[in-house]
Amino acid sequence: KMTAKKIVEKFGTDALDVIENDHEKLLEIKGLTKSKIEDIYKAFVEQIGIRQIVMFFQKYNVSPSSAVKVFKIFGTGTIPLVQNNPYILADQIDGITFDKADEIAMSLGFETKSYVRIASGIKSIIKRISFLNGHTYLPRPTIIAQAVSMLEVEQGPVEDAISQLLLSGELISENQGDYDAIYLKLFYDAEREVAEKLIRMSGVTFDID
C-alpha cells in the first residue's frame, strides 16, 4: 500500500500508464529496486490479464471463479489458446463441461465434425460414464455408440479419432477378449499404480502386463 501511494504521488493519473508501458521510470522513486519494480509490473500484467479473461468468458456465462481457474492453468495466453481450441477447457479444467466448451466452439465457428471436437467428446464420454459405473475404462463399441449419438456425427470420424488418440498416447487400449477396453491415459496409469502397490504389499513378485 505504501509503495502504491508513492507511485501515485510521483506520477499522478499517469501511474498505471507508467507501470504498464514505462515501468523503468519507477526507479525514480526512492527505495524501489529493479526486482521490486519487476514484481509490481508482473502483478499489474496479471491483474489486467485476469480482467480481460473474465470479460471474455462472461459472454459465454462462465463464472469469474472458473475464468480465474482457467487463467491459473494457461496464463496470459489464455484467450488465443481458447480461440484456437476451446475444447482444452473441457479436457483440462475441472468444472467446465464438454457442453460448455462445445457452446464456445460453435460460437467461434468450429465444425461439428472437427477432430478436436470429436476427440474431446470421446474423452468426456470415457470420464463421465467410467465415473458413473465405477470403472476406469469403456468398451470401444460403447464409446463409438455414445459418441455418434452425443456428437451427432458419423461412425467413421469417431473411429478415426479413437485411432488418433491411441497413437498420440492420450488413450490406452487393452484387449479383453470380446472387446477392446479403452482407458484415458490418466486412468490407466492410476489403475496400474494401485495394482502395483497392492502386489508390493502382498509380497508377490510377478510383473503386470
Name every feature range the model reports, one short phrase each.
Residues 1-180, 197-201:
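Accessory alpha-helical DNA-binding modules that contact the DNA backbone or grooves
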Residues 178-209:
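ASCE P-loop NTPase motor cores of helicases and related translocases
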